[in-house]
Amino acid sequence: MATRVTVGEPLRWAVVRVALDPATGHEQGGTRRALVVSYEPFHRSGLATVCPITAARDEARYPGEVAIPVGTAGQTRPGLILCQQVRTISLERVVGAPDGRLADPGLRRAVRLALAHHLGLDTPAVGDGALVRD
């Protein structure tokens, strides 16, 4: 699959389109938007860690979900960043160029906290950015 992202391109907090099939069970599948949450040195491996974005709902129901408003990083409808669906993918699954970036510090913090909660990490250190800086 052709991609327009290259190793070394800043991707953390970018919203990209990814081809997630094949998916099994309750995994998010299809080609959809996703938020890149992994840090830059990891991308040199040709991989990225992403959280899928859905436009099916606009209110978080679970601690692993973060609402993403219309107009944020190219979002055309209200949606949710599904931090409980976090997965590592090959950069070859990225379709086209990034749609935009999640620039809002409050949303970034909410994503960090949702990931920390889902993974059972110490949320105060993650939430204030002490472990990994932008």
Give residue spans per PLM region.
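Conserved functional hotspots at enzyme active or ligand-binding sites that engage polyanionic ligands
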Residues: 1-134
